[in-house]
Amino acid sequence: MAEEGNQEFTSKMENSSDSASTSPDAPQPSENPPSPPTSPAAPQTSENPPSPPTSPAVPQTRENPPSPPTSPAAPQPRENPPSPPTSPAAPQPRENPPSPPTSPAAPQPRENPPSPHSNSSGKQPLSGTPKERLKKARSSSHSFCSVVKRMKVENDENNETLSEPGESSKEENCSKAQESLKNKDSEPGEKSSEEKNTCESKSSDTGSSNALPKESENAIIREKLKQEKIRLIRQVEEKEDLLRRLKLVKMYRIKNDVTELENLIKKWRKCGQRLLCELQSIMSEDEDEKLTLTELIDFYGIDDNLLHYNRSEEEFTGV
């Protein structure tokens, strides 16, 4: 009976492990799983049943593994013990164990081993054709530099050797060219100086001939301007005098009435006529001959229009 109970327990454990691995949402088993069911008539022989693993991540081995069945009909237990149910959050153990952590500086092992021709700096290995191209390019660049340097050195040496015998000829050619240039420069300079002198002489002659009429014209213009200035000054003075008189008349008219002024003028005229008549009578008494009014008016220089005197009739009008 004990053997049958152990077989049932192992089969249940296998079923529970399969269900836990297939369904992640299955409830986690408790730390102390229930004891396997036994028949009511069969007494339990094993006092210490095998305890399940406590941690979900690390499986614990049993201290007392169950004894294998002796009967030929009983199924034999598996070599690997059933894995305990794990939580969905806990990482399941992988078939291949994880590689140990390596330092960042340590080179990781590669699937393809590095070839012996690869560089120590960690560059990818190149195939045969690129390597040959690089070698050719390097050799060509080195050879080009060396050729250029040799050419420079050879050119410098050739220039030094050629410059020594040809220096005198070059100096002679330069001196001849400078002399020819000086001669060419001096010839047009002389021609230009002669042309300048002739132009200056012609301009002086024409300038002297043109200066005389210009001076006479300027003198005439100055005289005309002076006369015009005098005429304008006189006109300005006359206008100012007329303006002054008009201002006086305006002032008198504003202060006095015109009718009053006319009456005053009439009174003054009558007084003047009376005075002339009295003088005529007095002077005629002193002298034997009688003096006329025209003689008195001419003697005193009085205007006939002011006194309203008529010379033809020798009488005052408007008396």
Curated annotation (Swiss-Prot):
Which segment of the chain is annotated as a signal peptide? Answer: none
Is the keyword DNA repair assigned to this protein? Answer: yes
Q: Which GO terms describe its biological process?
A: double-strand break repair via homologous recombination; positive regulation of DNA-templated transcription
| Superkingdom of the source species | Eukaryota
Where are the residues of the annotated region Disordered?
1-215
Q: Where is the composition biased (Low complexity)?
A: 16-25
Name the principal localization, coarsely classed.
nucleus
Q: Which residues form a coiled coil?
A: 220-270
Q: Which residues carry this modification: Phosphoserine?
A: 67, 71, 83, 87, 99, 103, 140, 143
Q: Give GO MF terms, alphabetically.
A: transcription coactivator activity
**Residue ranges, compositional bias (Polar residues):** 117-127
Quote any Pfam family the record assigns.
Mei5
| Compositionally biased intervals (Pro residues) | 26-40, 65-116
Q: Spans of biased composition, class Basic and acidic residues? A: 167-203
Q: What keywords does the record list, in alphabetical order? A: Coiled coil, DNA damage, DNA repair, Nucleus, Phosphoprotein, Transcription, Transcription regulation
Q: Which cellular component terms (GO) are annotated to the entry?
A: nucleus; Swi5-Sfr1 complex
Subcellular location(s): the record lists: Nucleus
Q: Which residues pair up as cystines?
A: none
Q: How does it assemble?
A: Component of the SWI5-SFR1 complex. Interacts with RAD51; the interaction is weak.
What family does the Swiss-Prot or TrEMBL record give for this protein? Belongs to the SFR1/MEI5 family.
Q: Which PANTHER family match?
A: SWI5-DEPENDENT RECOMBINATION DNA REPAIR PROTEIN 1 HOMOLOG (PTHR28643:SF1)
Q: What is this protein called?
A: Swi5-dependent recombination DNA repair protein 1 homolog
Q: What is the lineage of its organism?
A: Eukaryota, Metazoa, Chordata, Craniata, Vertebrata
Gene transcribed to yield this protein: Sfr1
